[in-house]
Amino acid sequence: MGSEAIGALGLGLLLVLMILRVPVALTMLIVGVVGFAQIISWDAAVAQLKTVPVEVLSNYSFSAVPMFILMGVLAAHSGMAGKLFDSTRIICGGWKGGLAIAAVGSCGIFSAISGSSLATASTMTRVALPEMERYGYNRGLATGALAAGGTLGIMIPPSIALLIYAILTQQSVGDMFMAGLIPGLLGLVMYSLTITVVMYLRPSLAVAGEPTAWKEKLLSLTGLVPFLGVFLVMILGIYFGAFTPTEGASVGAFATLIYALVKGMRGAQLWHSVQETLALSAVVFFMLVGAETLGYFISVSRISFSITDMLYGMDLTPIVVVLCILALYFVLGMFMDSIAMLVITVPVVYPIIQAMGIDPVWFGILTVLTVELGLMTPPVGMNVFVIKAMAPHVGLGEIFKGVAPFVVSDLLRLTLLILFPVLSTFFLL
């Protein structure tokens, strides 16, 4: 049997194991080791199994992962999220639908230091949903805004998804973060406009909150200082070369730790944050070990090159290839976790993108945005299920219905990024 056929069988086995709910990291590890052994030898596969974990764990760039996770966990447990929503509520709450806009804005700002969509969605739901329910907001609108706002964490830097894509494709982490800045902020603006349009079409879904004076609005900006301070120090430091993205992650984590200690985080809370960080980091690293092992198998099977040759034979233009891959990501996103989808598929599709001369940074932004859509779409929609767990009294169908306008908004944003690549590459020019 040829190596390409073994590669195709391996990908089929990968799909079967995932359908059987075998953990994604273990699935990639099994397929990678067995496939590599079939093409090369069992001795080589065992030797690889010994070296790959060391390669991953000793990779300097990967050390940014636990730092970004720690930063988000500390922000979630230190009370920063509550103060953040209080500030945005005072600024926007007097508008019709203003609390939903405040929730989306809070999600965008919180995600700037959490790096995780699920952490952003769960934290801000705990803080913002009770307030929106108190004012009689339609539950679909309220939870839909939070589910959509949570997805901003996967794009606005620092983003764990962008970091993993950069490492898997050997791109500059700093370039990926800079490329995600405008698309992330564009998402924040478009979500706010979506709420405004929904309120215009269906004004009964929400009411205006209590109006506040301009002096109070200006004073409330102090609640944004910790977030903007940490975010700007990291992003500007990375952009101007003061430190690497990995060092920037450590700077951000240290600054967040200082804030948490000043605000009274002590002993048990701090230890719980460290434990949560270690648990989440272990999951990510196990997946990366599996992805690296799978990547070696895909490389020796040469299946990516076979797919590339087939595409060349079909005489498809690069943009058509990109659209086909994004359509595949959109479908996969309905069933798979976002990080799992990246680590499984990027080793397969990246050689194709590279061979066709497509900008890998631009493609990475499109990929992550399409993955972001999967966090909101049924049947899986991880953000939706996180919010359902936080608000069991709200029906799942109600949340998915509330998310629908934001899915349309994201499709429009994806279209803009495809038509105008400069939106992704502006800070790289």
List the model feature ranges, each with a label.
Residues 1-429:
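Alpha-helical transmembrane segments of multi-pass membrane transport proteins
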